[in-house]
């Protein structure tokens, strides 16, 4: 019997008599926030709520994709999920699917029954994405028909006889029609249609809640999402919003009461679910088969390449220890069947080598001697006694992860090679999920509330860099035209929106490369960048399913070093590479100890430069420690300052809690700095295996991400420590150290890989400062410092920097040979706003036809538009034609289009610029300050003088006036070297760096630059809060404060921050 009336809501008064209860229920139409603005709960929330309600299962079916299915699957794998409630059933059935919007505006949900159906669903979703613009899908029923095998079809209403017959012809008994009751006339009409089809065709019906959220409390957020989707406000949305909060997950009791007239349709969901056997566990990944020499297996070829590489790496003979480790690693790689993975990476790196693209592997891969012998990494892990299990072990239960950095200016060549070799059917990049962050969440929610744009912008500005924190105070509501009540709701919704997915982006370099078509494993769609395709899963999804990805990353310093090596060979006649630079160079380490490291790799930050004089690195391993030391792990573990104290005042003897710890900690003076040390410690004194130790590292990382404790692991560690006679006091210290390493402890192998590049960049800066500056400037953007700081630093190191000149400057910065010696010539690339193709026109014409006769000849030959000519003039590029830049700009401003066209069309015609009757006889030359401003506006710096050298006269006169009034005068960075601690000073300079690291407890650090060097400013939280607008909006600052000295380091503790001028 059919009851077609609407049933009361779950929130209505329910009858006192016993309610009928269905024997089971599976929600088959779950939707999450990975439907992008059309779902108000995360996959984790949807699945967890279904489990809590005691459902037999749930299908996660987001719009046109499988974006969130792995997250839901991961939630189901959590053992703690099934202990939350006695109602929970451990045989909870997690299904996946997708809701597809078709070209006839109808919708169907497809759920794979088996592996074939899953592959078909991936193909269908990929086809729909490729036929539409990014963010949309375009599919016809005829296209779906081709892939219908293995798929259940849940056809969403409205239905007609014609539509039902068409779908039944395709899907036969795999076609089902969903019904729901949400207190709307629309759902009542759908029920009427469904019951009619059941009566006429024996259509298979089932019950769903058609949930867009896990709880009715998310209805306001769903309204915000809907308004954002339709670009409207809550006041204007009208019927675009759902009418009530019924479209959420409900308890089985409430579902049973809603459908007490048709409990069979509730229980039908369990029957439908039973037809589905597919699980994401069935996805089997096969790495592409490598091209092998005739008659060789992957295992044999891997061994051949490794031993051949070992002979090259160890020219005096392979050490027994290295050979034993090679055999151990090759055996494990064979057992885990990872040969093709390594061989694929070897092929990619060989391609880079052939193209002379500098690359280097890093991360845990540097713990592997096989990677070292294959040329994937540059660190000898046997010599450095690195722990292989940090990279690969049987206990890890996950594929190896090899990160390879390529030159950032040439990585695209490597990416295109991968696409060309494997094609888009077998290679795609891993996606990143772009989420709503604080500012965007506030902006979008404010738009939905109808706030004026001016107030929204004011609100964003008021937030500053503290996120939503400052807006949580109800007292600020009036400032933005709202009452405290609505403001509280507004902020609550913005906070809920924070972290929601917005759209997909491209991972920095993660590639999934497969033997089988990738679209049988995961849907693929267009990326924003032309010619790029991304899978619908991010790196965490890929890692959880244990799929192998390769990371083709980029590093600016590799670009810089390659360009430096080219310059050394072409200009200086020195043929160097990373492998042939002189090691243990004393002048290089002297420079490092003085913290003269602007522009070099990894040790150029403010914190590193403050540490170097205390650390006094004198060899390569010291650099390895230095790089790892200034990281959140050692800082949070309280290891940095104790280590530096030991470093400055080494004790006669270091006491270890256990003799087994001495070989592990001796190199770092008894204090653990690296992840590998922590792993070795638990192996030595807590009876962990190396593989279990790596699992500990993973647990630490997971605990840190969840801000959780490590529970049972702690007890096992303490038991092991006690067994080895380690006191509880020292056990507490070790455990605190381990917790400090959670997620942020730095791998020794990673630090060693970086240290190679650090030493190379320092050596070049020390011995060839002109070449290093040139390579660094030609590799921008990269690093901490702007070109102006790099140029000023080079000049302080004795480099002669020649200004822009269209007669001599190329696109890039160049080393120019002169009778007086080599000089660094500024490149035309330094000018703001001129495309490279136009700059190349200047360079090419000069090389083909010789130097330009005059400005008219330049205009005639290059045919550049007036806007570009004016930018060249403002940057000083025409001063070889006329040193009076004001006159040049006047002449170019007065150049009419007719005159310019005349020049372009008459290559031999002589034509004088500046014949305008309004031109004055002579324009006065600029003042030094005007010249500086012009050059800074056009390219960000001047090679002639530093702004502070021009302002110094003004500051000196002001200082004299201040002294007469007994106020604190201004001092330069040079003056500060002679100042005593607690001396009151005023300093001024250009802002070089502003940093506010999360480990600094609200402190802010600024590096000011003047004509003599740098001034370190320390800003405490209360001063930062008071003056932060000035800090972030002004490039020239005046600081009032007092001197603080720590060894050779001089800081100014700020008391007041003002704009200079």
Curated annotation (Swiss-Prot):
SUPFAM superfamilies found in the cross-reference section: PHP domain-like
Keyword line: Cytoplasm, DNA damage, DNA repair, DNA replication, DNA-directed DNA polymerase, Nucleotidyltransferase, Transferase
EC number, UniProt record: 2.7.7.7
Compartments (UniProt record): Cytoplasm
NCBIfam families registered for this protein in UniProt: polc, PRK05672.1
Chain's role: DNA polymerase involved in damage-induced mutagenesis and translesion synthesis (TLS). It is not the major replicative DNA polymerase.
Descriptive protein name: Error-prone DNA polymerase
Organism: Bdellovibrio bacteriovorus (strain ATCC 15356 / DSM 50701 / NCIMB 9529 / HD100)
Species classification: Bacteria, Pseudomonadati, Bdellovibrionota, Bdellovibrionia, Bdellovibrionales
